[in-house]
């Protein structure tokens, strides 16, 4: 062990050096030592001799290097430089210096320092350091400015190359110079830095002191000694009586010797009786004494035996259930007893309640004395012994949490203290892997239990939160998860009950409820009200009184006071056992909790399998160049083996996965829950294959249903031939079609080369016989469970396809998070290998492996490989390719500077602003090993110019396609004099059956009319815009005319300025649309006439025969649905029917859009050959449009399907791609302007529409009025509504001008006179002003008459002039125009007869005298007098301000619903024909 002190520019650092490791010193915060402004990087390492070097320069005690701002001093200390001295025992001041009188003498120390106040260090925890101003003193590596400073226990002091550490009993010293001192040395060994695994804790073998359980039997006393009950007098009296009788007999009759014999015998009998009596009595007394002595000795031995057993029991209890003070010592010393209890031990979840007289662990057997009249004291002694050892006095009273809910009752503060003792006991002896606590308590009680937050057992690891519920937020955050956990455990028990297999749930949850109000309205209440012991959950209730407890509580503990408690019931049995709770006032509970918090419990010794291994470590390389990819590609051949490294079984023990058909392949399953490393193991496998096999031998098709995450990682990998993400119904069918197309292609190539297996083909390809590469295709689905759920048909077909394609080199790898219910028989039978990482439960493990092993995996990346029927079954650690690629090799790790606060829930909460932990200017994006390897392969591919394999899976159609990407769009290059066949490029089509994507082109001659049906907002207008621009760019304006019917929301308005557009119509322009309908009818009729004239059948033949170029006409209709609701529906549909029937041959095409096919009349829709469908809200509508189509159209704007043979889908092209900052309308205007500037020629004519007002000046600009009036002898009136052409009064015949209202009459007169004023310059014009209100025109005419006398004269003048001209007396060449203002009044004033009127109007026009008569309708046409009727009969020309249906000048067909005429509107009638006109204004 070495210590290195680095000093530079007043910065001081210390580094503990470990043998075999390397270190860096630099400005970089990721370095082991960071020194500001250092200006270089110093690498510390050992050479072969073990000498430490700085940038290859050995450090011999001190090494000084030149730095940018100061010298860099490196001082190396070894064990030999270490010493430790006690403080002086008497004085309170000591000196360290170079003088002999100093308490500690170090010759190299130039200036002495003083250590003071160490005698009180136990109380103050510090000493004082005093030095002079010339001495630099560092405390904890910070330079001190003051001359006196405090140094606390554990602080480091550095002064002039001397390192000191303050301890409670002395100073530790590091000095490269000899330290001489009279002080007591404490130790000679330098303390080592803590090992890397200092805080790890492994269980030691447990020592269990069993409580005695052997029965002890107290035998009954021996049977009492039977006492001889014979009374001595009974033995004496008979012989005495015999003697007395003998004497009586002798006195009566002396017998002699016989008497002596009788007396002798009786005497002897008496003697023997007396002796026998006393002898037996003595023996009896001895036997009684011996019986009593022997039995008491037996009882004494039994007492010793019982006492020994009791002592053993008490020792066992005290050992396994120590006091809290003893527990503190156990934790403090990190004793091996910590976490000694497991769920398999008999005393799991047992804890001490207190001290009590507890039941013996052994059975003391004693048989009571049966009924006996005589009392046997020995029975009493035995009974006394039996009763004396009824209990074990003053022993720990044990309770457990295994047998039903328990409850504490009493004062809450006392109960909380008991719960604290329980917490300490259970937490010390049970690992947090096996036991967790959840407290539902009052918020005010959390402070009492605050110390327990340090216990690792208080963290619910499944929820990553502390097990405290004390308010609404914590309740919702925790209890819902606990509810789900309980539910899952109950379900597991129900399922396992069928197999009679016991389940042990871990961790055990101790659920303490001190406040029921928090759960009373929560769903978890249904489980709290039952016994959950079977499910690994122990319930503890706390209430004030027993009446408040739930009925299912089995054990009740009453805490009466701090010194008295009572175990009322235990497991439903009444025990009423009093006990004395332990006093823990002097125990630091938080200290115990903090000590336990420091321990990281490792349940098993580290396996040979590493916890993790990076991808490059698996290949035993540091840089990607060392992978030797090119050589691997050259040497490895898939037809021999496809084995590639996937992970390690142990150190240098590589596990390979070989999907060769004869090895582990060709198909397989991967299962692993979230966070198990499932995606990572797939990534490593893909990367391993890519490293070992050429892109022409191995390729990947990724199905990432979760959204393309994995696909994005490999987007630059040359082996990747396609990705399938986010499949919907349409994409699923497309994917299947593409895969099947690939199979057909492979079968075709096999047939061409007469092989039937991929391996044979690869041999031919290596030999150069086969030229098209055909790699093994790995189809990998990262989450097929969801895919199968959403697209079951696709999944079924995919598995079936893979089964068929095994000889064609198709490999299928299916991955899922939860295999239960997903892996069916077909998938299982087709999957030879299975990879199982950590799965959610045993059922999932059994589903994939047929064993529960995978449910016990805890590490990410740890997996089982199973091949076949356990032909191979191995546990390994898969490689991780997401590790940071350290290309510089300096292994600098980014120091996370994020500051976290552990909040009240036990969760980390970042509190500093920069959550990245890095300064902005230092932020650096690190490349992963996966990215580095892919980049390396990509560079090799580029360098070797490897040709990409044809992709079986083309990417989904993009959502944005532009016309310029599909065809030439520069109209300058495309416009020509030659008439071209119309081809429309609709967009980018997708033909998975042919593995092709390209322009969707329609030859309009074959395709015919086009109907696009789609829901609003899905590209209908874009479709039309694209066609409009496509036509405009390929044909000049004189070759293509477009009529835009915009019945939607003005979507076609932006393109109206395109020079090809003849006109633009909206639905409210009824008159204009009516004109357009007539215009189209005229076009049809005219073109039919031309074809008939040339005897050809279509417009192309006509153009060819005649050399003419009749333009194609396009009727483009947006939102056809509106037609159904329009007033012009019938006329429009009639026109549409005609065009759809006859238009194709005539070069008239319809392209329409709508939202419903039903809006189009069936007769019309039937004639539309090409039908296109966008996405539709109503699915059944699709069938009506394009026929029976199973795929459907994707919900993407612009995605469409067409009714060709394959129901081809395509993405509608947009007419152009916008430049940055450019708007859509700006882009259109730019191109339109360029077209107009480039084109020289005629533009298509607009549909003429009547302006709001017709001004004389506008007429003058548009027409040559002088010519019309003087040469054509016509008088301009206004514009015709139909053609918007000039309508003029014929001045070669008389006419009448009439109106209903006088005001209208005046206006009409003004218009007539305005035109006549031009005419009068060269012609003779007479104004007869019978109304006398037009005198303002008197100067503009040749003659003006208004006086009644003048009018009478003029009547005669008319007659004479007509006669003179008829007789030839006057020339008829000179035309005289006579305008009569108010013809009725003129007749009244002049008295003209019927015949005179006939002559004036009929005969006068024959001799070039033209009468223009004006008057109100009621006075002229509507009058009933004979003169008026004569006038009407003789005139063929009229200008009437009256509805045509109501006038009587000519007869017309009934016109129902004719609108009222607006101001300035009127009818011009000539020879029974009429035109609606708008009168011009001055």
UniProtKB/Swiss-Prot annotation:
Provide the primary localization. membrane
Bilayer topology annotation: Multi-pass membrane protein
Residue pairs linked by disulfide bridges in the UniProt entry: none
Q: Which UniProt keywords apply?
A: ATP-binding, Cell membrane, Membrane, Nucleotide-binding, Repeat, Transmembrane, Transmembrane helix, Virulence
Q: Which residues lie on this side of the membrane: Extracellular?
A: 253-256
Of the GO CC terms on this record, one is: plasma membrane
User: What Gene Ontology molecular function terms does this protein carry?
Assistant: ATP binding; DNA binding
The record, for Pfam families, names: FtsK_SpoIIIE, FtsK_SpoIIIE_N
Under InterPro entries, the record lists:
Firmicutes_EssC_C, Firmicutes_EssC_N, FtsK/SpoIIIE/SftA, FtsK_dom, P-loop_NTPase, SMAD_FHA_dom_sf
Q: Any idea where this protein resides?
A: Cell membrane
Task: Cite any additional comment in the entry.
Answer: This strain lacks esxB and esxC.
Give the similarity note. Answer: Belongs to the EssC family.
User: What protein is this chain from?
Assistant: Type VII secretion system protein EssC
Chain's gene name: essC
